[in-house]
Every structure is written in structure tokens, then in C-alpha cells.
Regions:
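Short Gly/aromatic-enriched secondary-structure transition segments
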Residues: 66-74
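N-terminal glycine-rich dinucleotide-binding loop that anchors FAD/FMN and/or NAD(P) in oxidoreductases
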Residues: 75-82, 138-142, 146, 265-278
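Extracellular beta-rich ligand/substrate-recognition surface
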Residues: 26-36
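Receiver (REC) domain switch-region micro-motif
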Residues: 110, 161, 299
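Glycine-rich beta-strand-centered segment in the early N-terminal region that forms part
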Residues: 43-59, 73-124, 157, 167
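Glycine-rich cofactor phosphate-binding loops and adjacent beta1-alpha1 units
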Residues: 203-219, 223, 228-230, 234-247, ...
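NAD(P)H dinucleotide-binding glycine-rich loop of Rossmann-like/cofactor-binding domains
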Residues: 78, 117-216
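Short structural boundary motif marking the start of a folded domain
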Residues: 7, 15-27
Length: 314
């Protein structure tokens, strides 16, 4: 980043920090199947130096939000008795205030890791308590979520999250002129899929584990027309031609599959030698269609049901 750009970002961060002291709006979960746009304020103590203050720049909708929306505080990550929870866990933020010694500075862009605790904690202070909650971004906090304008995070949070096995709370990104903020917010679902693929295992001829999607394998995406499946397939396709899957099966609704016929990703895979087979999930002959060019080595799905299990083991 040029010196002029850095000064501009710093100046904008100063402006936003002043705005963060005022009332501002956010999208909050306030009950089962109840979402409201509300005005809120960060506590004045947030600006005394022991908190990170951030501004939300981008957020991606995730299907896993739906479960929290349906269940509210019956959800394991939503505190019991909460009156409002800020939604949004796939988010890009800009640092407006950082505690001394934090290694972050005003104006930095960061993606926030969504998983925060593997044991019950007080979500306001990031301290373990017996009656706490398994805290996570977009599920557990009033003052932190990608769909509120300004956020506060205790200074102890980064080290606590690291100690819980979730890695870095803040993940700095380097913006480029041709990269949109929404694209950067996709870093979180991309990381989910990258991690999933890295830890997939198959068995070799000797019965040993082989981690990762094997070269020249047959990969199936059941109900695979959604965004997460396409991100996963993008990662699978990011290898040399000789390591691409031989066959990729994708099931979904006919309307979605018709759209996929024109996807650049699908056309690129076909041009590079992968057979991409799109199968209507309502096809009565679906089990035969999913084995027409060989049985699957790897099956990906977001939907655990008897139907998808039958398709996976076909």
C-alpha cells in the first residue's frame, strides 16, 4: 500500500472510530425466527483502551445462520436468556482501535475466525464459566457480529481463542485494487472448505489413510449447487490437469443444474478433461446415474439424511 493510501485509510479509521461512539444500526436475532434491524451503542468503557474496536466492511450470508435463527437461545452457541444477538460470521472488518501490544494497528483489514471456544465461556469477557456458552462469531455476542456497523472485542480474546485451538482470531488481509471487499469476506467459507479437503481421507490398497482428495478420483457433490459446494469444487479444481478428478457428479434441482451448465468453473473442468455429470435430484434413476462412470471415491454434502446416505453409498 502506498504512503498516500495508508494515510487515507488511517484518516478514514479515525472518522469511523468517532462514529463508533454514536448510536448505530445492526441486524439482530431477538427470538426464534425473529430478526430485527435495531439501533445499539457500544458501552463507553469500550473506548478506554482495553478493547479492539472494529467496523464491519463486508459480510456473507451462510446457511448455518438458519439454525440459530430457528432455535435462538435453544442453540448451543446462543446464550440462554439473551435479548439480542448480532448476526454475521463470514465478515471482513477494519481495525479502528487496538490495545497496546496487540500487534494490530488502526486501518488494518482483518477476517475474524468464527469459532472461539471449545468450553463454556462468558461471551462478554472471554473467560470460562460453568454456565457459559460455546461462543462463536454471529451466534453469541451482542457487541460483535458482521451485520452490525461497529464491534468491540476484549483484549484477552485473541490469546484465549488461540488457547482453545481455533488459531488466530484476527487474520490480516492485503487488499488489491481489483479485489472487492465482499470477495475478501469469502475468506472464511473458503477456509472451511480448504480445511475440509485437507482432512478428507481415503484408504490405499494397503489400508493406509491417504489425506486429501486423491488425484484422478471420482468426486460427488450431493445437493451440490449451493455456494459452499461450488467453493469446494473451486479448490478441488485448483490443481494441475493431470491431478484433476476423472469424474465429478453434482445433484440438485433442475433449475439450478441448468444454470450450472453455463458456469465458467464447470466449462473449465470439462475443457481440462474432467467429466462433469449434472443429475436431477428428483430423477427416479438417480442411483444408477451416480455410478454411470464409476463409483465415488469422495462424497461431499451439507445434508445428512437417509436419502443422501443411500446416494453416497450407491
Amino acid at each position: 500500500m502506498s504512503e498516500q493510501s495508508a494515510q487515507s485509510v488511517y484518516h478514514r479509521s479515525e472518522q469511523l472510530l468517532k462514529e463508533a461512539r454514536k448510536s448505530h444500526r445492526g441486524v439482530f436475532l431477538t427470538g426464534p425466527n425473529k430478526i430485527e434491524i435495531l439501533t445499539d451503542e457500544l458501552p463507553e468503557s469500550s473506548f478506554e483502551g482495553d478493547y479492539f474496536i472494529t467496523a464491519s466492511l463486508g459480510n456473507c450470508r451462510c446457511a448455518s445462520d438458519a439454525k440459530a435463527i430457528r432455535q435462538f437461545d435453544a442453540h448451543a452457541r446462543v446464550p440462554s436468556g439473551a435479548d439480542r444477538i448480532a448476526l454475521g460470521h463470514e465478515t471482513l472488518q477494519i481495525i479502528l482501535q487496538a490495545p497496546e501490544g496487540s500487534n494490530l494497528k488502526k486501518g488494518e483489514l482483518v477476517v475474524i475466525t468464527p469459532g472461539h471456544s471449545s468450553e463454556p465461556i462468558d461471551p462478554l469477557e472471554f473467560k470460562t464459566v460453568s454456565d457459559g456458552v460455546l461462543a462463536a462469531l454471529g451466534y453469541s455476542y451482542r457487541f460483535l457480529g458482521g451485520l452490525r456497523q461497529f464491534n468491540r472485542i476484549p483484549s484477552a480474546a485473541p490469546e484465549f481463542v488461540r488457547s482453545q485451538g481455533f488459531g488466530n482470531l484476527f487474520n490480516p488481509v492485503s487488499p488489491k485494487e481489483n479485489t472487492s471487499l465482499i470477495s475478501l469476506a469469502h475468506a472464511e467459507p473458503f477456509a472451511c472448505n480448504y480445511g475440509t479437503n485437507k482432512h478428507i481421507f481415503t484408504l490405499d490398497e494397503n489400508g493406509n489413510f491417504i489425506y486429501g482428495v486423491p488425484p484422478r478420483s471420482i468426486v460427488t457433490y450431493l445437493s451440490g449447487t449451493a455456494r459452499m459446494a461450488m467453493i469446494n469444487l473451486t479448490i478441488v479444481a485448483s490443481v494441475a490437469d493431470e491431478d484433476l478428478p476423472n469424474v465429478v457428479y453434482v445433484t440438485g434441482s433442475k433449475s439450478k443444474l441448468d444454470e450450472m451448465e453455463n458456469y465458467a468453473l464447470v466449462n473449465d473442468l470439462r475443457n481440462r478433461g474432467t467429466r462433469v455429470v449434472l443429475v436431477d435430484r428428483k430423477d427416479p434413476d438417480i442411483l444408477n446415474k451416480l455410478t454411470e462412470f464409476g463409483k465415488s471415491d469422495v462424497v461431499w454434502t451439507n445434508y445428512a439424511s437417509q436419502e443422501t446416505y443411500n446416494q453416497a453409498v450407491a
